[in-house]
Structure formats: structure tokens, C-alpha cells
Amino acid sequence: DFIHARSEKEIIYTRNTSESLNLVARSYGETHLKAGDHILITIAEHHSNLVTWQRVAQKTGATLDYIYVDKETGHFPEEELKKIDDPRVKLFAFAEVSNVLGIDFDPKPLIQRAHAHGAIVVLDGAQSTPHKPVDVQDLDCDFFAFSGHKMCSMGGIGVLYGKEELLNDMEPFLMGGDMIEDVHEQETTYAELPAKFEAGTQYVEGAVSLVAAIRYIQAIGFDEIRAQEKRLVTRCLEGMKKLPFIHIIGPTDPEEKEGLVAFEVEGVHPHDVAQILSAEGICIRTGHHCAQPLHIYLGINASCRASFYFYNTEEEVDYFLEKLKDVRKVMGYDD
């Protein structure tokens, strides 16, 4: 009931979002796409939803196209969204929320638009599922992937949702025990869904921890989670705007940010920023955040990212901002 699938047959346990997307790419993309078809993704994708489709394009002869964000706002211009209307697009894959820009791309209208022109839609929910309610039936996406470790469960557990009729039409991604019905010397029949895609001994501990995390999140409620995250992001952005050496990546309006803020510190490499903050007990992410093409497109070598969840406090945000002021001082700047 967490993402409102129609049946448990539509829920497949994987290791993470990356494996879920690879499953779709291998079991659907490589067998259902061909030369002349187009795969459409966005420049804002995590590598798991980009490199996978590069490979499918290379193996099938399909063409890989991109929707580009506006470099100033981070949103998709209508001129770029018109690419969805191309009838040659047979598969459209994109993230509901960017893990760099922090933007919720409002997937439902994009899904409807893609379906109107005959495309299958793969939605990466890794950055959205921990922070907002998800209803795959209302969204009407064909596939939806997310990870447990981003929402308080143990690592190594993920989920792929797929419409039952599509999953039934796909070959298994992995072969082995438990995904079979009958095995003979020259042929095998496969088990019913979801076991068909769950070969071998499953990570039971991870699945149990994911269920516990879901129940915990549901007990708190997404209204409270979103309200707390909005308070934290607002406080962070307001503080950063007062620091002239900080460049915020993507929108600076907290209403357009979902639980994270990516930024640059003028004159200081992101890895140095992380090292200095780490010495003060603050953990941030630095580098490309598995979104190198987006950084290249934006003309950014690398960036820092501060992520917030409901367990963070406004006092922690204030501490982070205070220590951020010290970063350039440590590097010898006199601000």
C-alpha cells in the first residue's frame, strides 16, 4: 500500500534503484526496442538512469535523445518538452526529483503526454519516494524504482514496480533458484510474478527492514516530513543567500527544492569543502553526485550537496551555515 500498486505481483525486490533500472533496461529495453526507435531521457538523470539507456541504444540500434533543462531555472522549457511528442520515442525515462537540482519535475503531465504518443515511461523515484507520497496508479507510470537506504532502511534493498502486463511480457533478468517453475535438460518454465524476477536467496533482512522503515515513515506522516524538510531547506537557502561566496545550483526558491541544496564555494574545491566540514562533524556529498553530464552541461566541474531529512534540526542547519563561513578562512581567504 506504500506506493499503491494494484497487486503484490507488481512489486519486485532488488538491491537498489540502480538494479531496478537495469532490470527494465535489460528485460524490456533490449528486447522491445530496435533501430529507428528513440529512447528519451533528461540531462538531469542519475547515471543509473542514463548509462543503462546508453547501453540499450548501443545494443539495439535505437537513438538516445535528451531533454535539456534551462540553465538558469533548472526546469524543462516547453521547447524541450516537445521532444516527448515525437512518435519515434518508444521509451521515456526520467527522475521524479533531481538529485542535484532538487526540483520535483511534476511527472504526471509528462507521463500522460508520453503515453499519448505511445511511449512506455520509466520513473526513477529514488529521490522522491522518501519525501512525498507516491501513487503509481494515479501517476500511471509503467515502471517505478526506488531504494530503501534513502528512507531509513538497511542498505542493499530496493524495489521495482512494473505493470503486471508488461512484467509478464518480459524475460527474467537473472536466472537461478526460486525463479523457476519446471527445469528440464533443454528448457525451463519460469515462476509466476514476482518470483520470476527474484532469482536466488533473497535479502530477507533487507526486506524486513524496508517494511519497518515504511511503517515508521507512515506513522510520522508525509505532511509532517515535508513540512520539516521545507523548514530546513528554507533556513539553509536563506542563510546561503547571505554568503556572497556561495553559488546555489538550481532554484533558490525553497518552494522549488525537495530536501537538498547543491552549491559551490567560490575558490574552494568541493572535496576541500567536505574535508573541512567533516572535521566539524558535518557530512555532505561532493563530486558529480552520479550526474556528470548535468554538471558538464551546466559548466560546473563538481559541486557540494547538503541533504536534509525529517530527523535533522534547524540548529543543525545553523551549525552547518556557521561552519560554511569558516571554509574559505581555512583555505586562506580573508572574507
Regions found by a protein language model. Name each.
Residues 1-335:
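Pyridoxal 5′-phosphate
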